[in-house]
Amino acid sequence: MYIAILKCESMGRCKHNGEVSIFGVRPASFPNFPFHLMDKIGGFVILDELWLRRWCEIIEYPMRIPTLYVPIEDYGIPTVEDMDLIVDFIKYHVSKEKEVVVSCIGGHGRTGTVLAVWAGLNGIKNPIEYVRERYCECAVETEEQEEFVIEYLKMKKRG
């Protein structure tokens, strides 16, 4: 996992430091949180249980930034209900003209899945490609994650 991050960053392909914003959502990996952008941030979505304790000590309690914890197993997918919760959290903060940082440990699979869903909900026709081109070609790592993005967006289109 960390080898993939180093490989991507060293070759200039990934932007795990929060510099990319996809419709108000900034992806960041564990070691690269965009602390320099704190004035723009309205909330954080943390997709990994390992973050919980340390994150509370660093950001959530002292800085009072709303944080949504949705623990998803590494290389896994959220439930539909969890994705709905994530989307609602993002919509709320973006509607207040704030951005949301989404992060897991590596910043590829789980983070990429959320980014692709968000891009699709914002009208992008090929959201997985879009996220891979703008953020990281390693985003949305597994077939299961790709299928989740496609099926979730189909379900939301049907209403």
From Swiss-Prot:
Gene3D superfamilies according to UniProt: Protein tyrosine phosphatase superfamily
Entries under SUPFAM superfamilies matching the protein: (Phosphotyrosine protein) phosphatases II (SSF52799)
Domain of life: Archaea
GO molecular function: protein tyrosine phosphatase activity
Entry-linked InterPro entries: Prot-tyrosine_phosphatase-like, PTP, Tyr_Pase_dom
GO cellular component, one term: cytoplasm
Family: To M.jannaschii MJECL20.
PANTHER family in the record: TYROSINE SPECIFIC PROTEIN PHOSPHATASE AND DUAL SPECIFICITY PROTEIN PHOSPHATASE (PTHR23339)
Protein name from the UniProt record: Uncharacterized protein MJ0215
Lineage: Archaea, Methanobacteriati, Methanobacteriota, Methanomada group, Methanococci
